Regions:
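Charge-lined substrate channels and their catalytic hotspots, especially those that engage the 3′ end
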Residues: 1-272, 281-327, 358, 366, ...
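Electropositive polyanion-binding surfaces
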Residues: 23, 163, 173, 179, ...
Length: 703
């Protein structure tokens, strides 16, 4: 019936009543008419139709100003409706009773093609509020519940039975039973995460808030019992023996789930690069609970020092991990690369290896940067230097075609044994880290190119062209801020974006400007539609190299086995993959964003926790953002805090087109990129808040 309704309304630009629609359907029985009404309401909830106050229906796509999507509310109380091609901003005054996570219909107030369209919530189509994370609090003489998410402006009444075992301060997950009033819900406690003062509960609470599963089901645990701890002789049949090759791994000091190993030979003018990836698909097979669990999670989550794996540690740290001096099953991509960094030949095949050594970035960087050879690395020093040569060649080739290096630093939180943040250090991408990145990109491109040439259904990692208007807005903004732009932006290509970024690379405020440009661009996603990867300047790109921690990589391995190793390219297989991979791509993109948001929330919380011990201390920072309510300042350790406008000396006006605050007498101006000195005045772990004030001299002037 839905298809018939869509056909009827396809050409209609005005709303149609049920009777109007039924004139074309010729339904006569009351039962059929009731079914029609139910179908129309269902299609409205799904966002296919718009229903007016007069109960008239039209296709949503035929309306000029209506869109549907999930509402995401940020800390400021404002929201964004996730729509294609652009998210729509919704001011807190225009939410119309909608809460974070609602599926809504939004009416656009500005033009649809505006760089940042704005709208208001017209209808709440679906409220998918099932579970909420929060804290058990004292409510007079009884126990109550307070959601951790302040954006969820709701009241909750808990059933008495479910409160058994709960005490004040417990972090819990509740199940919503039903809505019993406007934004008021009856619920029950589903799970006690732990007491808020217990080590690690803060991180597990954020994981729960993002619906990240921290435990595996009994069904998964049962399947694990049938997976061996060692590779058998039978497993080696049909695989190429690479155990005599000089193959090793390079990872962080504390890495336990090792899924990539490398090898290299310099043969005349060319290099032979081997990238050998753990064959997780040999153990996590379609149709198993392990596979379904991996699909559901989509990715491993790295929350400070807590790893929540996509597959159980028994596999990720065991038989799937390329540990040294043990035989492991792999899928190898061996490439012949010329002196210009071009792949001139390659082979992709099932293999087995025995890693010679588990190396660390720290020790590899000593060899490559300082020519110091740590103990135990002597047999590998020459090979590492050859790898360095090849990595330099590959990087130069990437840069020549427009590879964009945003140079964004990342933080690492150091915690004590009780899980308290005691230090923040920058993750430095040294020579070894860049080497591995270059090798993995080469393998990912080679695998993607091969399947693309076969014209078979596949899952790609894609990055669309940036919106020209957003790039123009960025350049106009930085010009207003006083920066000169020499790059010709008439045609936006990776090379022009690279040139634009390089104009600021030597400036102190480069990281801030780079981040602003990055936010002007679209996000990389997974897709079956191969549009290339703009940021990498790649025509074909996929994720092949991390099947332990990313479901798309696991899927790519399964497809390689199907298409290349088993030669199953029949129409049934092709048709199945064509449909199934769309779901994999969409779900994987969603779980990736969710994991990144959880990681960001943990980082913000731990930064605030760290700064609680540094209230009253002075720091130098750079203004990273300017709003009508103050300045955001980023310190050298990447902690960002707010200097509220009320703490500034005098009256200031916000100039949005210049991202500046200017004093009433025009003598003082604060803009993005300015260096300032601040003092920490407040830090709150629960709210993930850090507040600063500008440091002043004896005359009241900021330094």
């Amino acid at each position: 019936m839905k298809d018939k309704i869509i056909e009827i309304l396809k050409e209609e630009t005005k709303g149609q009543s049920i009777n109007d629609i039924n004139k074309n359907l010729h339904l006569k029985s009351m039962e059929d008419i009731n079914m029609l009404e139910d179908t129309l309401n269902e299609m409205t909830t799904e966002g296919i139709l718009h229903k007016s106050k007069n109960h008239e229906y039209m296709l949503l796509e035929n309306t000029k100003s209506l869109k549907v999507g999930k509402l995401r509310i940020n800390k400021s109380g404002n929201g964004f409706v996730e729509c294609k091609p652009e998210d729509i901003f919704v001011h807190s005054n225009d939410l119309n009773g909608a809460i974070n996570g609602d599926f809504v219909e939004v009416e656009i107030k500005t033009r649809l093609n505006d760089p940042e369209p704005e709208g208001y919530i017209r209808n709440i189509l679906k409220r998918d509020l099932k579970k909420v994370v929060g804290e058990i609090v004292k409510d007079k003489k009884t126990l109550g519940f307070k959601p951790d998410d302040e954006k969820l402006n709701i009241a909750v009444k808990l059933t008495k039975e479910s409160l058994k075992g709960c005490v004040e301060g417990h972090k819990v997950i509740i199940d919503i039973i039903k809505e019993i009033g406007n934004r008021t819900f009856l619920a029950k406690v589903e799970k006690i995460i732990g007491h808020k003062n217990d080590p690690g509960v803060d991180i597990l609470t954020i994981a729960a808030k993002h619906s990240i599963e921290t435990e595996f089901s009994e069904a998964v645990k049962e399947e694990l019992k049938n997976i061996p701890d060692e590779v058998s002789e039978a497993d080696l049949i049909g695989r190429t023996d690479l155990t005599n090759e000089m193959i090793f791994t390079i990872d962080g000091d504390d890495t336990k789930d090792i899924d990539d190993a490398i090898s290299v030979e310099h043969t005349g003018k060319n290099y032979k690069l081997g990238v050998h990836i753990a064959d997780v698909s040999n153990y996590v097979k379609v149709g198993t609970n392990l596979y379904e669990s991996a699909f559901s999670r989509g990715t491993s989550s790295y929350l400070a020092d807590t790893v929540i794996p996509m597959i159980p540690h028994q596999l990720s740290n065991g038989i799937c991990s390329l540990n040294p001096e043990v035989v492991r099953l792999t899928i190898s991509c061996v490439m012949t690369i010329d002196g210009n960094g071009k792949v001139i030949d390659y082979d992709i095949f099932p293999s087995y290896i025995k890693s010679r050594k588990q190396m660390t970035y720290k020790n590899v960087n000593k060899i490559l940067d300082e020519n110091i050879i740590p103990e135990g690395y002597e047999p590998f020093a020459d090979t590492l230097k050859t790898m360095h040569e090849l990595a330099d060649i590959l990087r130069k080739e990437k840069i020549s075609r427009g590879y964009i290096d945003f140079g964004i630093d990342e933080d690492k939180i150091i915690q004590d044994k009780n899980g308290k943040a005691i230090d923040i250090v920058k993750r430095v991408q040294g020579t070894g880290e860049k080497l591995i990145e270059d090798f993995m990109i080469a393998a990912n491109e080679t695998v993607a190119t091969h399947i693309s040439n076969m014209d078979l259904p596949f899952i790609y990692r894609v990055h669309d062209l940036p919106n020209a208007e957003k790039i123009e807005d960025f350049t106009n903004l930085i010009k207003q801020m006083g920066y000169q732009v020499h790059t010709n932006l008439n045609k936006i290509t990776p090379v022009t974006m690279q040139k634009l970024l390089n104009e600021f690379r030597d400036k102190d405020e480069f990281v801030i400007l780079s981040d602003m440009l990055l936010r002007s661009m679209k996000k990389a996603i997974y897709s079956t539609n191969n549009i290339g990867h703009f940021g990498l300047a790649s025509k074909n790109y996929t994720h092949f190299t991390s099947p332990i921690r990313r479901f798309p990589d696991l899927t790519v391995h399964r497809l390689l086995r199907t298409y290349l190793f088993e030669n199953r390219i029949d129409m049934e297989t092709i048709n199945f993959n064509a449909k199934y991979l769309i779901d994999v791509a969409e779900h994987s993109s969603e779980t990736e964003v969710n994991a990144i948001e959880a990681e960001r929330d943990v980082l913000d919380m731990k930064m605030a926790e760290y700064m609680m011990d540094h209230i009253g201390e002075e720091y130098t920072g750079i203004i990273s953002g300017v709003t009508n309510f103050g300045l955001f300042v980023e310190l050298d350790n990447l902690v960002e805090g707010l200097v509220h406008i009320s703490t500034l000396n005098g009256y200031f006006t916000y100039i949005p087109e210049m991202l500046s605050l200017i004093s009433f007498d025009k003598k003082t101006k604060y803009r993005v990129g300015d260096k300032v000195k601040v003092v920490v005045t407040n830090a709150n772990k629960e709210g993930a808040i850090v507040d600063f004030e500008l440091v002043r001299d004896t005359n009241g002037n900021s330094k």
